[in-house]
Amino acid sequence: MSFLKKSLFLVLFLGLVSFSICEEEKRETEEEENEDEIEEQSEEKKRFEPVPPGFTPFRQT
């Protein structure tokens, strides 16, 4: 009986450790994806900055 308890605890412990490692990796990939999205949004904002009043891309003579 003692052998079964030890084996069961060992299996549960190893499963818990592997689960926590997977969750940590998942969290890291989500953070990287969020950082990429933030960079893309900031690049879009830079492209579409408001034009100052009175500005025209055409030459005025």
Swiss-Prot record:
Expressed by the skin glands. Residues 1-22 form the signal peptide. Residues 23-50 form a propeptide. Its main location: secreted. Disulfide bonds: none annotated. Residues 30-42 have a biased composition (Acidic residues). Belongs to the frog skin active peptide (FSAP) family. Bradykinin-related peptide subfamily. This is Probradykinin-2. It comes from Pithecopus azureus.
